[in-house]
Amino acid sequence: MAFNFNWSPLMADAGFYTRAQDLLTAALNKSPKPPIIVDDIVVTELNLGSNPPELEILEIGDLAEDRFRGIFKMSYAGDAVLTLKTCVQANPLNTYLLTRHPFTSPQPLAAATGLTIPLQITLSDIKLSGFVILVFSKQKGITVVFRNDPLESLKVSSTFDSIPFVRDYLQKEIEGQLRILFMDELPAIIHRLSLRLWSTEYSELETTCDQVTNPSLEGPGQDPLLNPPQDPVDSFGNVLSTSEIASLSLDSGVEMHSLFSRKNALRIAALTDSQRTLSLFTPSIREVVFRAWTGSIEQADGPSGLVSPMSPPLSRTQSHITVASAPLSSQDTASVASSQSRPGLPSSGYSGYGLSLGAARHSKAHACKRKKRVIDLRPHRKPTDDIASISGESSCTDSTITTTTKSAASVYSSSIIPEENNDDDPVTPPVSPVRNSTVRRRQTLRDRIVDRDDAERTNIRRPPIPAEFGHEFPLRPTQPLPSNEIDRNVTSPNPKPEDSHHFQPPRQDTAPIRNIPSAPLGPPAQAPIPASASASASAYPPEKPTYTQSFPPSFMEVAQNGSILEQAWMMKMASEIARRIQDENSSAMGSYVGSGSGSGGFWDRSHTPPPAYRH
């Protein structure tokens, strides 16, 4: 069976090309275009050429006078030409920004400016090959379906042929769009054209739809703002009644523009109260203040000074400052005065914005603050002062505890303890006591022993130990000590017996500590020595008698007038010093007796330094 295709009437019909161009333009602009194309694609030229396609009949399923159904193999290599015009974006940065969300873009200024260039594209040398299913009916028109991708190749000529990468890019993009056109859009275009030709009902229906879709723009326009909303409110959020709306409309139509819908006003208030995010209905976070809100704009409640009663600008409803009607107490007045005098916090209207969250919920009536007691140990010039002071307020008890003690000299008298100002300020933390940098560091027991050894070796007299560390102490008392209760308390226990061959020193009472003046080593003095101390006295070089019957009061007597802390520290130091002296005496006597020679002095022999005493 043979068919003759009359291709010349299609080329001679001018109306056919016009309708085909309109349908192709609509089809090309219907699908999503790449971001580089910034204008509509317009088909300016369409020519099917003089060479018709070749059809090979593979199957005929239905054949009648008014219908036909068959499967063909189509091949086309004609001289058809298609010309398109559009505008492209030559700035790649602008193309990138168009494909990204504006919230995440860096918002450049000059670099984001678009550069639009007109583009003309001509498609020629189109080669098609594929299997086509053709269905014809006078009632339903012509339906053409491609079972495979028919496009084999085509030639794309554009304005940017001199730029290789632009030419290749356009070639690839246009081929992709044409494949979509042949598979999806071309069957629909052919079907609509056939309905216009053979179906009068479809043509009338299409004309009616075009009139409804594109109404005529003739006639005066209508202002939608002149019609009030269903639930109008004024600029202050007050709902307007029908009579008020009528009175407003009688005066002039200008005031109608200031009416707001109540729903829109609530949405704007919710947007103002939101966390400045993209979502309009972000759930609120309780007891959270955003530091970006606490700016100078809140002093005037917005740049325009307008205050909305529904939601104040840049503020939260649960963070408003509530002013109590009750008068301030004396403690509140003092705390307010101290907070006003403190430099560092601005005294503006929004300075307490972030600190007053939940002020209405956590009132002062049911709060229980802990007591803050600061004991002042500083010496005062007045005979009697209040050493203990209580700072801070207590809502549970109104009692004030004041402890009056006597001023006592202590080793901590040189340090300065500043007054604490506890104003319950949540912003400014309490200042730690500042220590005076010129205060002399207190010497430990090891420091005093090392100083004494150095002075003994170099025969240099050391300065006396300060009075707060105790009095000078002798190696061996030359006079009987007065027996009193303090001396009996500080008497050290007898040292433990070490070995049977070591010398056992006699029991020695600890005298008030005195400074040991060093003297040059010399021959033993001819002063009478008691028999009980003859063995121990031979191990030491004689000292000049610097002791008298009248001893100064010991440090224990001074400690009796001090505080309990000072007495305990003095007792501990006295017992430790007495123990160390007894250990030194016993070790020195044992080493001297074991050597069996008295030619060398005490410091000529090897001396192991005592271990460090940590207190």
Curated annotation (Swiss-Prot):
InterPro entries cross-referenced by the UniProt entry: Mdm34 (IPR027536), SMP_LBD (IPR031468)
GO cellular component, one term: ERMES complex
Biased composition (Polar residues): 325-342
Composition skew (Low complexity), residue ranges: 394-410, 528-541
Superkingdom field: Eukaryota
Domain (SMP-LTD) ranges: 1-195
Stretches with biased composition (Basic and acidic residues): 444-459
Annotated region (Disordered), positions in chain: 325-347, 379-552, 592-615
Subcellular locations according to the entry: Mitochondrion outer membrane
Domain notes: Lacks alpha-helical transmembrane segments, suggesting that it resides in the membrane via beta-sheet conformations similar to those predicted for other outer membrane proteins and porin. The SMP-LTD domain is a barrel-like domain that can bind various types of glycerophospholipids in its interior and mediate their transfer between two adjacent bilayers.
Quaternary structure, from the entry: Component of the ER-mitochondria encounter structure (ERMES) or MDM complex, composed of MMM1, MDM10, MDM12 and MDM34.
Protein's UniProt name: Mitochondrial distribution and morphology protein 34
